[in-house]
UniProtKB/Swiss-Prot annotation:
Annotated compartments: Cell membrane
Organism: Arabidopsis thaliana (Mouse-ear cress)
Stated family: Belongs to the Cold-regulated 413 protein family.
Regions of this protein lying in the Cytoplasmic compartment: 64-72, 119, 167-181
Principal localisation: membrane
Protein's recorded name: Cold-regulated 413 plasma membrane protein 4
Amino acid sequence: MGRGEFLAMKTEENAANLINSDMNEFVAAAKKLVKDVGMLGGVGFGTSVLQWAASIFAIYLLILDRTNWKTKMLTTLLVPYIFFTLPSVIFQFFSGDFGKWIALIAIIVRLFFPKEFPEWLEIPVALILIVVVSPSLIAWTLRESWVGAVICLVIACYLFHEHIKASGGFKNSFTQKNGISNTIGIVALLVYPVWTIFFHIF
């Protein structure tokens, strides 16, 4: 074998090695990309599920406080919590004409027929009014950011503290027949903001 043939074979071997190395790196990068996309998709799905759950539990607590199981919990704080956790599709629906009609009818009834306006409707109507009149900075920017999650976390922590105090201690809040329903609901309120803040930081 001549020197020229040896050099040609060596060059082809080096080229093949480089191609194989590049292919291996490409495959590894593709696998990492698929893994990262899957993780992000999982996080996004988990966030959406927890957001729905947070809204449902907040509404549940709002209804529960209007029944015979009334507590000393400040349920008006659930209004801003629901505002910040309400899923976008529902928020957009109520911020449109449907919500405006409800707000208009409620205001007219409240002004001209105050005795006919039920007390239990005041908080839901207040929530719809806030959704309708909130500026875009609050309605879309803050709601979708970590700021909204921090506000929800502060509200949930305060409600949990007040509920424990009203129940006569941490143990009683989990053992009393009426208190445990509120306790489970309030603990559920903590999950979504903690999850959201964690993934905003990390």
